[in-house]
Curated annotation (Swiss-Prot):
The gene is SIFV0074. It comes from Sulfolobus islandicus filamentous virus (isolate Iceland/Hveragerdi). GO terms for cellular component: host cell membrane; membrane. It is found in: Host membrane. It is a multi-pass membrane protein. Its main location: host cell. This is Putative transmembrane protein 74.
Length: 60
């Protein structure tokens, strides 16, 4: 088990959840294109990381 990988996944998840919360509190953030790009980036990182971890687990 790669602890660095797990820690980075948790950090990404917490930041993404906090950003989604801020978006619900202040929907005008969606008018800022960079905010949307950052949200998409964090979501993509979480999805790719989940798939990578699942693929590593199935090799054993």
């Amino acid at each position: 088990m790669n602890y660095f990988s797990v820690i980075m996944y948790l950090i990404n998840s917490v930041i993404f959840t906090f950003m989604i919360f801020l978006t619900f509190v202040n929907p005008s953030l969606l008018n800022d294109q960079y905010w949307v790009y950052i949200l998409i980036g964090f979501f993509t990182a979480i999805v790719f990381h989940s798939g990578y971890q699942a693929g590593k687990g199935s090799e054993k």
